[in-house]
Amino acid sequence: MKRKTIMALILSVSMAASMTCAATAAFAEPEDAAETTDDAEATDDAEAADDAEATDDASAEDADQEAADKVAALIDAIYVQERTDDTDAQCTEAKEAWDALTDAQKELVEGEEASPEYFGRDTGDASKDDPRNQDEIGENELLVVSFGTSFNDSRAQDIKGIEDALQEAYPDWSVRRAFTAQIIINHVQARDDEHIDNMQQALDRAVANGVKNLVVQPTHLMHGAEYDEMTAAIEEYKDKFESVAIAEPMLGEVGEDATVINEDKEAVAKAITDEAVKTAGYDSMEAAAEDGTAFVFMGHGTSHTANVTYDQMQTQMENLGFTNAFIGTVEGEPEDTACDAVIAKVKDAGFKKVILRPLMVVAGDHANNDMAGDDDDSWKSMFEASGDFDSVDCQIEGLGRIDAVEQLYVEHTKAAIDSLTK
């Protein structure tokens, strides 16, 4: 009996121990499960935070792009050639919207015509210019008509330079300004708050001020499309003045073919080459030629019949003995003035150094971008890419700042004023 009691006691202790272990194990399993659950929850929280941050970033990027797109649309709305009753308000709205952007948002502005450069590019101090839109004109007005430029420094030096020379020469006449490019007028107004008259505004201003005698001096290079549009606009106002006269553009009469040149073309050829060699550090065109340097004068080009003027300027250079002077055009009209054609001419003539300079009244967008820009299709880049030249340099200066050219306009204006008394 005693032995059975002992065995029962041992069995009872063993069973109790087993039950204790089982209970311990049962309690241990939930502890491990809790740790796993905590880890999973922490991971989910981190992923949720990352997702939220990514969503916030995406939302911020969308908001930035939306703000930039709004400005681009406002710029495109004023990048037009027609002025409307809404133009002034649109110019103001576009500038205010641009100013409200962050620097990062400004870099995102991209539209059909819009880019960060529209408002962001530094083209000089607009306050140095004079829009010449004052009233109290008097009886005699000298209206200077230009295509225009949004480059502030060029506008002040080239266009204002001509206007100032005319005002000095004719103090009894009030010099006023008109631009024919509404796109440029809007750009300058929106960016710089400078208000320049278009043709209709300038002529309406003259009528409202009681002008009796109107002389119009275009700064255009030739009798091209811009000149034709200007004369058509003036024709509609002729009966509102006692007398009207239109002066010759810079290069005077066109002539029948490339061999026909005149004193105006000779004067301009001499003026631009004198300035070019001086800027380049040479004594003369001949000295530059001996040093292997060619000058390429880049005009705009036109499909108008007046494009023969460019060939006439090439003839004029040759008549002056300038074997290292070449005339080209941005538009490649006439065809022999296209960049590729000019590169071939300069190469065949044996010149290894090239200096590009605009054959334009103002050194504006064409001079800065089409001629001297860094893009692959600029003239500077194409001359360099040809591999035919040791150096390619640019002189970004318009014709309007050259004294001899300004005096040529003074002479043209004198002829127009004199015609009023004949």
How should these model regions be labeled?
Residues S12-S18:
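Bacterial N-terminal signal peptides
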Residues A22, W98, V361:
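Short, glycine-/Ser/Thr-/acidic-enriched flexible segments
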Residues A60-T123:
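Beta-rich interaction/scaffold domains
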Residues E117-I355, M360-K422:
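Extended amphipathic ligand-handling, pore-lining, and cofactor/metal-binding catalytic surfaces
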